[in-house]
Amino acid sequence: MAIELFYDADADLSIIQGRKVAIIGYGSQGHAHAQNLRDSGVEVVIGLREGSKSAEKAKEAGFEVKTTAEAAAWANLIMILAPDTSQASIFTNDVEPNLNEGDALFFGHGLNIHFDLIKPADNIIVGMVAPKGPGHLVRRQFVDGKGVPCLIAIDQDPTGDAQALALSYASAIGGGRAGIIPTTFEAETVTDLFGEQAVLCGGTEELVKTGFEVLTEAGYEPEMAYFEVLHELKLIVDLMFEGGITNMNYSVSDTAEFGGYLSGPRVINADTKERMKDILTDIQDGTFTKRLIANVENGNTELEGLRAKYAEHPIEETGAKLRDLMSWVKNPLTETA
């Protein structure tokens, strides 16, 4: 089924310009949303917890900074762009007491709404606007007169004009210049989590580490293994990003292409696909989210333990040494980004 696309011509910018918008959080997405909205003629304040390190950055960018509760009380559209694991407490303590009938509560990711961690009153508009790119790209494209495609979704529409509001917001941050794609909270949440866990973060990390282990255990130098299974990964991903898998296969050598066709299915096979389906089920039925929340409630002990364990893998020490030889590569372990 073909997706439906909307553009600036389909959006009424005056709708969002008639709202007072509080951006909760001033990280990667927060700064881009706030600046793009302001440049589109929208009145914006930033809501942050007291003592937030982001407050000074927001003030330097010319924004009024309020506490989260003050920002929520001032606004009639609240966009929550804080980390997933902080959103429920932010909503309960600071946002919910300051919501009024007809206010809008927007999110950049659907997890908390889809899994009922946040349950706004029925008279509140609940929507999502999610650019498909990091905040710095959303901002840079906007400044250049372009945009990043945006997903929009509606969970509650007590007034009947929630989609028009979401379209207006997405257009104001540049989404309408590239394409605005309607979806659902469920689809955005599940596909996003699955992509992160099975492919982008979890799957890729394990593939790289296992390849490194196979080569080093066979007696090859760790440096050679690092170059072949991690360093060159960016070259391949960039080719896929720019033109798809066919573009990547066209661009590499015949030897690499032929070997990939033969050996790829030996690594990622029918058994792998079944395990990926298990991961999808854990996401769909809430198993993963329950574990995520339990980790937070236990002081992040599971996450911290996993983080420490994974950081000890030999590929990390090898990579840090090699990246120090590459003046064009930023190494966040030794440099301030």
From Swiss-Prot:
Transmembrane segments: none annotated. Keywords: Amino-acid biosynthesis, Branched-chain amino acid biosynthesis, Magnesium, Metal-binding, NADP, Oxidoreductase. GO terms for biological process: isoleucine biosynthetic process; L-valine biosynthetic process. Residues 3-183 form the KARI N-terminal Rossmann domain. Its cofactor is Mg(2+). GO terms for molecular function: ketol-acid reductoisomerase activity; magnesium ion binding; NADP binding. InterPro entries: 6-PGluconate_DH-like_C_sf, KARI, KARI_C, KARI_N, KARI_prok, NAD(P)-bd_dom_sf. Substrate binds at S253. Its EC number is 1.1.1.86. Pathway: Amino-acid biosynthesis; L-isoleucine biosynthesis; L-isoleucine from 2-oxobutanoate: step 2/4; Amino-acid biosynthesis; L-valine biosynthesis; L-valine from pyruvate: step 2/4. Residues 184-329 form the KARI C-terminal knotted domain. Belongs to the ketol-acid reductoisomerase family. This is Ketol-acid reductoisomerase (NADP(+)). It comes from Corynebacterium efficiens (strain DSM 44549 / YS-314 / AJ 12310 / JCM 11189 / NBRC 100395). The gene is ilvC.
